[in-house]
Amino acid sequence: METKIKINNIQLFGYHGTGEKEKSTGQLFEIDIEVSPVNDTPISDNLAQTVDYTLLYDEVTTIFSKRRYNLIEYLANKIADTITNKYRVNSCKVVIRKPNAPIKGDFDSVEVEVISNV
């Protein structure tokens, strides 16, 4: 059995990107996190047996807000590396979307996905 803990569509406003408008005006970002805890199946009904998703959420918002990033790829890597090094997980997948990326044309979003395995 494999357990996955997911937080979908964390919405945060930030000033990440390479363009001047992105850096001055900012935009909405959407972030998904998926982790596989070391203990796939907890042996008791105890939070200490797994990964507390409220801590994962706090980790994401802290890293996102701590500084401005040019590349969302680098930001996604930073989040994934921090989570895999700080929490008892076998893997961490981070997806970051820019719904309003500065591209002329019709599209839903620009997205990067990073997977970090321990």
Where are these regions (language model features)?
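N-terminal, polar/charged subdomain of small-to-medium soluble alpha/beta proteins
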Residues: 1-118
